[in-house]
Amino acid sequence: MLNDTLALAQMLIARRSPTPFDNGCQEILIDRLEKMGFDIERIRCGEVDNLWARRGTEAPLICFAGHTDVVPTGPLEKWESSPFDPVTRNGRLYGRGAADMKGSIAAFITSIEAFVAEHPDHNGSIALLITSDEEGIAVDGTVRVVEVLKARNELIDYCIVGEPTSVDKLGDMIKNGRRGSLSGTLTVKGIQGHIAYPHLAKNPIHLAAPAIAELANTEWDEGNEYFPPTTWQISNINGGTGATNVIPGEVTVLFNFRFSTASTIESLKARVHGILDRHNLEYDLQWENSGKPYLTPRGDLVDAVNAAIHTVTGIEPELSTSGGTSDGRFIADICPQVVELGPRNATIHKINEYVEVSDLDQLPRIYQLTMESLLLRK
Protein backbone atom coordinates (compact mmCIF):
# COMPACT_ATOMS: atom_id res chain seq x y z
CA MET A 1 0.00 0.00 0.00
CA LEU A 2 2.92 2.36 0.70
CA ASN A 3 4.20 2.54 -2.86
CA ASP A 4 0.67 3.20 -4.13
CA THR A 5 -0.03 5.90 -1.52
CA LEU A 6 3.30 7.58 -2.20
CA ALA A 7 2.75 7.50 -5.96
CA LEU A 8 -0.74 8.96 -5.64
CA ALA A 9 0.47 11.70 -3.31
CA GLN A 10 3.14 12.58 -5.86
CA MET A 11 0.56 12.77 -8.63
CA LEU A 12 -1.59 15.14 -6.58
CA ILE A 13 1.31 17.36 -5.50
CA ALA A 14 2.40 17.69 -9.13
CA ARG A 15 -0.95 19.33 -9.87
CA ARG A 16 -0.39 23.03 -9.16
CA SER A 17 -3.55 23.89 -7.20
CA PRO A 18 -3.30 27.20 -5.32
CA THR A 19 -6.62 28.00 -3.68
CA PRO A 20 -9.32 28.02 -5.01
CA PHE A 21 -8.17 25.88 -7.94
CA ASP A 22 -8.21 22.08 -8.09
CA ASN A 23 -6.35 21.71 -11.40
CA GLY A 24 -7.44 18.16 -12.08
CA CYS A 25 -6.70 16.62 -8.69
CA GLN A 26 -10.29 15.50 -8.19
CA GLU A 27 -10.41 13.85 -11.61
CA ILE A 28 -7.48 11.68 -10.53
CA LEU A 29 -9.51 10.63 -7.49
CA ILE A 30 -12.70 10.13 -9.49
CA ASP A 31 -10.97 7.71 -11.86
CA ARG A 32 -10.08 5.45 -8.94
CA LEU A 33 -13.36 5.91 -7.08
CA GLU A 34 -15.46 4.94 -10.10
CA LYS A 35 -13.53 1.68 -10.36
CA MET A 36 -14.71 0.89 -6.81
CA GLY A 37 -18.35 1.57 -7.64
CA PHE A 38 -18.68 5.06 -6.17
CA ASP A 39 -21.43 7.33 -7.42
CA ILE A 40 -19.80 10.63 -8.40
CA GLU A 41 -21.30 14.08 -7.95
CA ARG A 42 -19.36 17.12 -9.09
CA ILE A 43 -20.56 20.30 -7.39
CA ARG A 44 -18.93 23.35 -8.97
CA CYS A 45 -19.42 26.76 -7.35
CA GLY A 46 -17.78 29.64 -9.20
CA GLU A 47 -14.10 28.78 -9.56
CA VAL A 48 -14.32 26.06 -6.91
CA ASP A 49 -14.46 22.34 -7.63
CA ASN A 50 -16.22 20.16 -5.07
CA LEU A 51 -16.62 16.40 -5.10
CA TRP A 52 -19.15 14.23 -3.33
CA ALA A 53 -18.59 10.52 -3.96
CA ARG A 54 -20.52 7.75 -2.25
CA ARG A 55 -20.43 3.96 -2.26
CA GLY A 56 -23.54 2.35 -0.82
CA THR A 57 -26.91 3.64 0.32
CA GLU A 58 -27.28 2.19 3.80
CA ALA A 59 -26.34 3.52 7.21
CA PRO A 60 -23.97 4.04 8.84
CA LEU A 61 -22.19 6.44 6.49
CA ILE A 62 -18.52 7.18 7.12
CA CYS A 63 -17.09 10.13 5.22
CA PHE A 64 -13.50 11.15 4.55
CA ALA A 65 -13.17 14.90 4.00
CA GLY A 66 -10.30 16.96 2.65
CA HIS A 67 -9.13 19.70 0.32
CA THR A 68 -7.00 19.72 -2.82
CA ASP A 69 -6.18 23.43 -2.77
CA VAL A 70 -2.90 24.60 -1.27
CA VAL A 71 -1.49 27.84 0.10
CA PRO A 72 0.96 29.97 -1.92
CA THR A 73 4.49 28.65 -2.19
CA GLY A 74 6.36 31.70 -1.00
CA PRO A 75 9.70 32.58 -2.66
CA LEU A 76 10.56 29.76 -5.06
CA GLU A 77 14.29 30.37 -4.69
CA LYS A 78 14.06 29.34 -1.04
CA TRP A 79 12.78 25.86 -1.88
CA GLU A 80 15.40 23.13 -2.15
CA SER A 81 13.32 21.63 -4.95
CA SER A 82 10.35 22.86 -6.95
CA PRO A 83 7.20 22.85 -4.76
CA PHE A 84 5.19 21.18 -7.53
CA ASP A 85 7.87 18.70 -8.52
CA PRO A 86 7.46 16.13 -5.72
CA VAL A 87 10.79 14.75 -4.58
CA THR A 88 11.55 12.04 -2.05
CA ARG A 89 14.76 12.38 -0.07
CA ASN A 90 15.87 11.24 3.36
CA GLY A 91 12.57 9.47 3.98
CA ARG A 92 10.46 12.55 3.26
CA LEU A 93 8.20 13.54 0.37
CA TYR A 94 8.65 17.24 -0.39
CA GLY A 95 6.17 19.51 -2.15
CA ARG A 96 3.45 22.06 -1.51
CA GLY A 97 0.48 20.24 -0.05
CA ALA A 98 2.45 17.14 0.92
CA ALA A 99 1.27 17.36 4.53
CA ASP A 100 -1.66 19.73 4.06
CA MET A 101 -3.32 17.72 2.77
CA LYS A 102 -2.63 15.74 -0.37
CA GLY A 103 -0.86 13.04 1.61
CA SER A 104 -4.02 12.42 3.62
CA ILE A 105 -6.16 12.35 0.49
CA ALA A 106 -3.87 9.75 -1.07
CA ALA A 107 -4.20 7.73 2.13
CA PHE A 108 -8.00 8.04 1.96
CA ILE A 109 -8.03 6.48 -1.49
CA THR A 110 -5.62 3.61 -0.90
CA SER A 111 -7.23 2.74 2.44
CA ILE A 112 -10.67 2.59 0.83
CA GLU A 113 -9.30 0.49 -2.04
CA ALA A 114 -7.81 -1.99 0.41
CA PHE A 115 -10.98 -2.09 2.52
CA VAL A 116 -13.29 -2.61 -0.46
CA ALA A 117 -11.03 -5.30 -1.92
CA GLU A 118 -11.17 -7.24 1.35
CA HIS A 119 -14.81 -6.48 2.18
CA PRO A 120 -16.72 -5.85 -1.07
CA ASP A 121 -20.08 -6.51 0.63
CA HIS A 122 -19.46 -4.39 3.71
CA ASN A 123 -22.25 -2.88 5.76
CA GLY A 124 -23.07 0.80 5.55
CA SER A 125 -21.64 3.34 3.12
CA ILE A 126 -18.39 5.19 2.44
CA ALA A 127 -18.16 8.74 1.10
CA LEU A 128 -15.52 11.23 0.09
CA LEU A 129 -16.05 15.00 0.37
CA ILE A 130 -13.29 16.96 -1.34
CA THR A 131 -13.09 20.70 -2.06
CA SER A 132 -10.65 23.18 -3.59
CA ASP A 133 -11.79 26.02 -1.31
CA GLU A 134 -10.42 25.42 2.18
CA GLU A 135 -7.22 27.43 2.33
CA GLY A 136 -8.91 30.60 1.10
CA ILE A 137 -12.17 32.23 2.07
CA ALA A 138 -13.99 28.86 2.22
CA VAL A 139 -17.36 30.14 1.06
CA ASP A 140 -17.91 27.92 -2.02
CA GLY A 141 -16.35 24.72 -0.75
CA THR A 142 -17.37 22.22 1.91
CA VAL A 143 -20.10 24.53 3.21
CA ARG A 144 -21.84 24.36 -0.20
CA VAL A 145 -21.66 20.57 -0.33
CA VAL A 146 -23.10 20.40 3.17
CA GLU A 147 -25.98 22.64 2.04
CA VAL A 148 -26.72 20.25 -0.84
CA LEU A 149 -26.63 17.20 1.42
CA LYS A 150 -28.72 18.87 4.11
CA ALA A 151 -31.37 19.92 1.60
CA ARG A 152 -31.95 16.30 0.62
CA ASN A 153 -31.56 15.00 4.18
CA GLU A 154 -28.42 13.03 3.35
CA LEU A 155 -26.72 12.96 6.73
CA ILE A 156 -23.31 11.60 7.74
CA ASP A 157 -22.80 9.36 10.76
CA TYR A 158 -19.01 9.58 11.07
CA CYS A 159 -16.49 11.89 9.43
CA ILE A 160 -12.69 11.89 9.40
CA VAL A 161 -11.10 15.12 8.18
CA GLY A 162 -7.54 14.57 6.95
CA GLU A 163 -6.02 17.68 8.53
CA PRO A 164 -2.38 17.21 9.61
CA THR A 165 -3.00 16.87 13.34
CA SER A 166 0.01 14.84 14.41
CA VAL A 167 2.87 16.60 16.20
CA ASP A 168 5.92 14.47 17.01
CA LYS A 169 4.67 11.05 15.88
CA LEU A 170 1.88 9.97 13.58
CA GLY A 171 -1.32 9.69 15.57
CA ASP A 172 -0.07 11.33 18.75
CA MET A 173 -2.87 13.91 18.50
CA ILE A 174 -6.32 13.93 16.98
CA LYS A 175 -8.74 16.81 16.96
CA ASN A 176 -12.15 15.94 18.36
CA GLY A 177 -13.42 19.51 18.13
CA ARG A 178 -12.49 23.05 17.24
CA ARG A 179 -13.16 26.47 18.65
CA GLY A 180 -15.50 28.86 16.89
CA SER A 181 -14.29 32.00 15.15
CA LEU A 182 -16.09 35.35 15.33
CA SER A 183 -14.56 38.50 13.85
CA GLY A 184 -15.52 42.14 14.21
CA THR A 185 -14.74 45.35 12.34
CA LEU A 186 -15.14 48.22 14.77
CA THR A 187 -15.09 51.82 13.54
CA VAL A 188 -15.02 54.47 16.27
CA LYS A 189 -15.93 57.94 15.06
CA GLY A 190 -14.44 61.26 16.16
CA ILE A 191 -13.92 64.68 14.63
CA GLN A 192 -10.89 65.36 12.43
CA GLY A 193 -8.86 68.45 13.22
CA HIS A 194 -5.47 70.10 13.62
CA ILE A 195 -3.32 68.31 16.16
CA ALA A 196 -2.37 71.66 17.76
CA TYR A 197 -6.05 72.42 18.48
CA PRO A 198 -7.37 69.27 20.16
CA HIS A 199 -10.23 71.23 21.77
CA LEU A 200 -11.65 71.69 18.28
CA ALA A 201 -11.51 67.99 17.44
CA LYS A 202 -12.36 64.61 18.97
CA ASN A 203 -9.58 62.03 18.75
CA PRO A 204 -11.23 58.64 18.15
CA ILE A 205 -8.06 56.77 19.09
CA HIS A 206 -8.04 58.38 22.53
CA LEU A 207 -11.77 57.77 22.89
CA ALA A 208 -11.48 54.11 21.89
CA ALA A 209 -8.39 53.27 23.94
CA PRO A 210 -10.12 52.69 27.32
CA ALA A 211 -12.76 50.46 25.72
CA ILE A 212 -10.09 48.52 23.83
CA ALA A 213 -8.17 48.03 27.07
CA GLU A 214 -11.30 46.73 28.78
CA LEU A 215 -12.04 44.34 25.93
CA ALA A 216 -8.45 43.07 26.02
CA ASN A 217 -8.62 42.44 29.77
CA THR A 218 -12.07 40.86 29.90
CA GLU A 219 -12.39 37.21 30.93
CA TRP A 220 -15.02 35.96 28.52
CA ASP A 221 -15.38 32.51 30.04
CA GLU A 222 -13.32 29.90 31.87
CA GLY A 223 -13.50 27.30 29.14
CA ASN A 224 -14.46 23.76 30.10
CA GLU A 225 -13.01 20.27 30.18
CA TYR A 226 -12.73 20.22 26.38
CA PHE A 227 -11.82 23.81 25.48
CA PRO A 228 -9.48 26.51 26.80
CA PRO A 229 -11.00 29.89 27.73
CA THR A 230 -12.30 32.10 24.94
CA THR A 231 -9.76 34.62 23.63
CA TRP A 232 -10.19 38.11 22.14
CA GLN A 233 -7.35 39.47 20.01
CA ILE A 234 -6.80 42.55 17.86
CA SER A 235 -5.35 41.88 14.41
CA ASN A 236 -5.29 45.41 12.96
CA ILE A 237 -5.71 49.03 14.05
CA ASN A 238 -5.90 51.73 11.41
CA GLY A 239 -6.40 55.43 12.02
CA GLY A 240 -5.04 58.68 10.68
CA THR A 241 -4.22 60.28 7.36
CA GLY A 242 -0.51 59.56 7.45
CA ALA A 243 0.22 63.16 8.41
CA THR A 244 1.72 64.00 11.80
CA ASN A 245 -0.34 67.13 12.36
CA VAL A 246 -3.88 65.81 11.82
CA ILE A 247 -6.16 64.25 14.42
CA PRO A 248 -8.01 61.46 12.58
CA GLY A 249 -11.75 61.44 12.10
CA GLU A 250 -12.11 57.74 12.83
CA VAL A 251 -10.19 54.64 13.84
CA THR A 252 -10.87 51.09 12.70
CA VAL A 253 -10.10 48.05 14.84
CA LEU A 254 -10.22 44.49 13.49
CA PHE A 255 -10.55 41.82 16.16
CA ASN A 256 -11.30 38.13 16.51
CA PHE A 257 -12.77 35.79 19.09
CA ARG A 258 -11.74 32.15 19.26
CA PHE A 259 -14.49 30.82 21.46
CA SER A 260 -15.45 27.62 23.17
CA THR A 261 -18.77 25.95 23.83
CA ALA A 262 -18.80 27.86 27.12
CA SER A 263 -19.87 30.98 25.19
CA THR A 264 -22.26 31.69 22.34
CA ILE A 265 -22.06 34.10 19.43
CA GLU A 266 -24.99 36.05 20.85
CA SER A 267 -23.47 36.36 24.33
CA LEU A 268 -20.12 37.57 22.99
CA LYS A 269 -21.73 40.16 20.74
CA ALA A 270 -23.89 41.45 23.57
CA ARG A 271 -20.95 41.84 25.93
CA VAL A 272 -18.86 43.71 23.35
CA HIS A 273 -21.69 46.12 22.60
CA GLY A 274 -22.22 46.59 26.33
CA ILE A 275 -18.59 47.61 26.86
CA LEU A 276 -18.59 49.99 23.90
CA ASP A 277 -21.86 51.58 24.97
CA ARG A 278 -20.63 52.01 28.53
CA HIS A 279 -17.75 54.11 27.18
CA ASN A 280 -20.23 56.33 25.29
CA LEU A 281 -18.58 55.76 21.93
CA GLU A 282 -20.05 56.66 18.59
CA TYR A 283 -19.26 53.56 16.60
CA ASP A 284 -20.18 51.11 13.88
CA LEU A 285 -19.56 47.39 14.39
CA GLN A 286 -19.82 44.75 11.67
CA TRP A 287 -19.64 41.06 12.57
CA GLU A 288 -18.49 38.02 10.60
CA ASN A 289 -19.12 34.53 11.95
CA SER A 290 -16.65 32.06 10.44
CA GLY A 291 -17.95 29.04 12.32
CA LYS A 292 -19.38 27.79 15.57
CA PRO A 293 -17.39 25.50 17.87
CA TYR A 294 -18.01 21.79 17.59
CA LEU A 295 -17.13 18.85 19.80
CA THR A 296 -17.15 15.09 19.40
CA PRO A 297 -17.05 13.41 22.83
CA ARG A 298 -15.80 9.89 23.30
CA GLY A 299 -17.98 7.45 21.42
CA ASP A 300 -17.96 5.13 18.42
CA LEU A 301 -15.74 7.25 16.16
CA VAL A 302 -13.23 8.48 18.73
CA ASP A 303 -12.91 4.98 20.17
CA ALA A 304 -12.45 3.42 16.71
CA VAL A 305 -9.77 5.94 15.71
CA ASN A 306 -7.97 5.58 19.04
CA ALA A 307 -7.92 1.79 18.73
CA ALA A 308 -6.67 1.94 15.13
CA ILE A 309 -3.86 4.33 16.05
CA HIS A 310 -2.81 2.15 18.96
CA THR A 311 -2.82 -0.98 16.78
CA VAL A 312 -0.69 0.60 14.05
CA THR A 313 1.65 2.83 16.07
CA GLY A 314 1.45 1.54 19.63
CA ILE A 315 0.69 4.98 21.06
CA GLU A 316 -2.34 6.50 22.76
CA PRO A 317 -3.42 9.70 21.01
CA GLU A 318 -4.20 12.92 22.82
CA LEU A 319 -7.63 14.40 22.18
CA SER A 320 -7.36 18.12 21.45
CA THR A 321 -9.48 21.07 20.36
CA SER A 322 -6.53 23.44 19.93
CA GLY A 323 -5.55 25.33 16.81
CA GLY A 324 -7.50 27.17 14.15
CA THR A 325 -10.71 26.36 12.34
CA SER A 326 -11.18 23.60 9.77
CA ASP A 327 -13.93 22.41 7.46
CA GLY A 328 -15.03 20.16 10.29
CA ARG A 329 -17.06 23.15 11.50
CA PHE A 330 -19.29 22.88 8.43
CA ILE A 331 -19.57 19.10 8.42
CA ALA A 332 -20.59 19.07 12.10
CA ASP A 333 -23.89 20.61 10.98
CA ILE A 334 -24.92 17.28 9.42
CA CYS A 335 -22.66 14.86 11.30
CA PRO A 336 -22.67 14.24 15.06
CA GLN A 337 -19.20 12.67 15.16
CA VAL A 338 -16.30 14.47 13.46
CA VAL A 339 -12.59 13.99 14.13
CA GLU A 340 -9.47 15.19 12.37
CA LEU A 341 -6.50 12.90 11.83
CA GLY A 342 -3.57 13.27 9.50
CA PRO A 343 0.23 13.32 9.27
CA ARG A 344 2.70 15.45 11.19
CA ASN A 345 2.24 19.19 10.83
CA ALA A 346 5.68 20.70 11.51
CA THR A 347 6.11 22.10 7.98
CA ILE A 348 2.58 22.95 6.85
CA HIS A 349 2.38 26.27 4.96
CA LYS A 350 6.18 26.54 5.18
CA ILE A 351 8.98 26.57 2.64
CA ASN A 352 10.10 22.98 1.92
CA GLU A 353 6.86 21.43 3.17
CA TYR A 354 7.12 17.66 3.49
CA VAL A 355 5.38 14.57 4.76
CA GLU A 356 7.23 11.66 6.31
CA VAL A 357 7.09 8.64 4.01
CA SER A 358 6.55 6.49 7.11
CA ASP A 359 3.35 8.47 7.77
CA LEU A 360 2.13 7.61 4.27
CA ASP A 361 2.86 3.98 5.11
CA GLN A 362 0.89 3.87 8.37
CA LEU A 363 -1.92 6.38 7.82
CA PRO A 364 -3.89 4.29 5.27
CA ARG A 365 -3.82 1.35 7.66
CA ILE A 366 -5.23 3.53 10.46
CA TYR A 367 -8.03 4.70 8.20
CA GLN A 368 -8.74 1.14 7.06
CA LEU A 369 -8.92 -0.24 10.60
CA THR A 370 -11.29 2.57 11.53
CA MET A 371 -13.60 1.59 8.66
CA GLU A 372 -13.44 -2.04 9.71
CA SER A 373 -14.38 -1.13 13.26
CA LEU A 374 -17.36 0.99 12.21
CA LEU A 375 -18.67 -0.89 9.16
CA LEU A 376 -18.03 -4.54 9.97
CA ARG A 377 -19.76 -4.64 13.33
CA LYS A 378 -22.53 -7.18 13.66
From Swiss-Prot:
Group of enzyme by EC: hydrolase
InterPro entries assigned: Bact_exopeptidase_dim_dom, DapE_proteobac, Peptidase_M20, Peptidase_M20_dimer, Peptidase_M20A
Pfam families for the chain: M20_dimer, Peptidase_M20
Keyword annotations from UniProtKB, A to Z: Amino-acid biosynthesis, Cobalt, Diaminopimelate biosynthesis, Hydrolase, Lysine biosynthesis, Metal-binding, Zinc
PROSITE patterns, sorted: ARGE_DAPE_CPG2_2 (PS00759)
Cofactor(s) needed by this chain: Zn(2+); Co(2+)
EC number: 3.5.1.18
Keyword Lipid metabolism: no
GO molecular function terms attached to this record: acetylornithine deacetylase activity; cobalt ion binding; succinyl-diaminopimelate desuccinylase activity; zinc ion binding
Reaction equations catalysed: N-succinyl-(2S,6S)-2,6-diaminopimelate + H2O = (2S,6S)-2,6-diaminopimelate + succinate
GO biological process, one term: diaminopimelate biosynthetic process
Active site (UniProt): 69, 134 (proton acceptor)
Job of this protein: Catalyzes the hydrolysis of N-succinyl-L,L-diaminopimelic acid (SDAP), forming succinate and LL-2,6-diaminopimelate (DAP), an intermediate involved in the bacterial biosynthesis of lysine and meso-diaminopimelic acid, an essential component of bacterial cell walls.
HAMAP family: DapE (MF_01690)
Subunit (UniProt): Homodimer.
Stated name of the protein: Succinyl-diaminopimelate desuccinylase
Naturally occurring in which organism (per UniProt): Nitrosospira multiformis (strain ATCC 25196 / NCIMB 11849 / C 71)
